[in-house]
């Protein structure tokens, strides 16, 4: 297993839990602190018995999809708890379990991987050779050893955020704001011609807040400089000044890469396997749910005596079965639509989306709906949406016909 981030530790834990012999290769100390924050809908961790790993949990969870101003600032109340992982606790949880499970750590950088009919050999930059029946690359969004298709520009979700203390609360105390698309701090020309962005924010307690200006997705991605400027203007319009910046977060990751080639010998997991939800950007919940599925597929294939290409093929099938491949294609097609929407149309879309029954919008965001359930939710959304959104959904532009054809072909 290559990597030491959340994806790597999640799959290594599931493999060790099935009694498999696992070795891991990482270029740095696997206990080194993780840089990014990881938010998750609390129901996801509750279902997995991991709620104790949350640093914060909010019940007052809202979004804003009005234009802003006195008449356009009513919150949409989600009625679902949201959580923020304690990164250190999550990392420690996995590392302690891996220590008990017998994981063997190797320090170094993978330079090459050689395959024969039975096994693979990972060679490090320092000359070490590590032999394994199967190699799993969980090194992140830019893997060296996992081949992915190329069907056009990959959109990036970009965000600029600050953890800090402010002259007055930037959001209501005790609240989590999922999406605040109000744009009354921008000019009419900016709202019509520049990329839409939203505020993602949370009260961390003790007078500390996290505020982050986010672009859902765009190719090329929105520059950090514009996001920082947008955040400053949003706060200034509310009369809020930053008194102390405790942490600055820059976040950029690919939203809609093509799926990896399932015929290859190296199996990906996490960002390396295009597991980011193409329409929401969520990843960690998917890691927690899908690591056991991949581990089960690998363990069953090994027990059946499969090796080489047959083993890796079984692993890829376990990670990306037909239903998930189809949903991935559906979400990519949907994201392509949303990236063409201007600020007003995007607000109208999300206002309609969050008027769906909670089980439908939650299942969409967490990728837990079956394909028939997903289609039913989207039919209902179309019926709820205003005509500007309906026209935007019906008109096919750019590479949308090709993405639609891929979806109809099964992903």
Q: What is the predicted function of each stretch?
A:
Residues 10-68:
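N-terminal FAD cofactor-binding segment of flavoenzymes
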């Amino acid at each position: 297993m290559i990597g030491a981030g959340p994806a790597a530790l999640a799959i290594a834990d599931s493999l060790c839990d099935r009694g498999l012999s696992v070795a891991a290769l990482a270029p740095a100390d696997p206990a080194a602190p993780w840089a990014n924050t990881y938010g998750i809908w609390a129901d996801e961790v509750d279902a997995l018995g991991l709620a104790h790993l949350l640093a914060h949990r909010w019940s007052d969870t809202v979004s804003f999809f009005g234009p802003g101003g006195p008449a356009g600032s009513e919150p949409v109340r989600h009625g679902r708890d949201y959580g923020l992982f304690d990164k250190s606790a999550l990392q420690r949880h996995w590392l302690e379990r891996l220590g008990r499970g017998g994981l063997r750590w190797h320090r170094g950088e993978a330079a090459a991987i050689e395959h024969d009919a039975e096994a693979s050999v990972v060679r490090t930059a320092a000359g070490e050779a590590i032999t394994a029946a199967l190699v799993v690359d969980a090194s992140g969004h830019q893997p060296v050893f996992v081949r992915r298709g190329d069907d056009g520009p990959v959109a990036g979700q970009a965000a600029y955020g600050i953890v800090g203390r402010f002259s007055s609360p930037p959001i209501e105390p005790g609240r989590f704001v999922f999406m605040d698309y109000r744009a009354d701090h921008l000019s009419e020309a900016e709202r019509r011609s520049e990329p839409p962005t939203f505020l993602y924010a949370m009260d961390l307690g003790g007078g500390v807040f996290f505020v982050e200006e986010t672009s859902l997705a765009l190719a090329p991605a929105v520059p950090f400089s514009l996001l920082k400027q947008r955040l400053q203007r949003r706060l200034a319009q509310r009369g809020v000044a930053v008194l102390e910046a405790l942490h600055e977060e820059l976040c950029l990751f690919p939203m809609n890469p093509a799926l990896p080639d399932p015929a290859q010998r190296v199996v990906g997991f996490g960002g390396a396997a295009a597991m980011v939800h193409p329409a929401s950007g969520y990843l960690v919940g998917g890691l927690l749910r899908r690591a056991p599925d991949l581990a089960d597929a690998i363990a069953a294939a090994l027990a059946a005596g499969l090796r080489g290409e047959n083993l890796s093929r079984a692993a890829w099938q376990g990670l990306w079965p037909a239903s998930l491949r189809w949903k991935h294609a559906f979400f990519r097609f949907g994201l392509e639509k949303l990236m063409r929407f201007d600020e007003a149309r995007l607000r109208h879309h999300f206002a309609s989306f969050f008027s769906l029954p909670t089980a439908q919008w939650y299942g969409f965001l967490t990728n837990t709906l079956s394909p028939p359930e997903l289609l039913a939710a989207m039919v209902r959304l179309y019926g709820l949406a205003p005509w500007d959104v309906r026209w935007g959904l019906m008109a096919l532009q750019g590479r949308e016909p090709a993405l639609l054809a891929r979806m109809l072909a099964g992903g």
